[in-house]
Amino acid sequence: ITATMANNAAAQDFVSRLPLEVTLNDYNNTEKIFYPSPKLSIEGVKRGCAPAPGDITIYAPWGNVAIFYKKWSQSSDLILIGSIDGDGIKALSVSGDLTVKFERE
C-alpha cells in the first residue's frame, strides 16, 4: 500500500518518524486510529476536512492519527496529512485491530 502525503508540517513530522510500527485500533467502524508519542506537530496547519476513504488525518483534540475507510462528515478538528493511493484502503477495511508498519519508499 502506498500513500501520498500532504505538504504540511504535520505530514512532514509523520514522515520524519518512519519507519513506524503501530497497532491500528478500529474506531466507530469507520476508521483505524493510533496515538503517536509524542503527538504530531499541528502548529500552523490548516484544520478542517470531510474525510473520504483512504484519507490519513489527525484528530486535533486527541492527537490521534485516523485513517478513514468509510466516508465521514466535515469536521473542523480533522487535519488532512495524506491519502492512501488507489484501492489500498481495502486492506484496512476489516473489522478489528491491525498491526502495520509505515515506511518510506
Where are these regions (language model features)?
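N-terminal secretory signal peptides
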Residues: 1-33
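A residue-level signal for beta-strand positions that form part of recognition/binding surfaces
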Residues: 21, 64, 97-99
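Short, charge-rich binding segments
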Residues: 58-59, 91
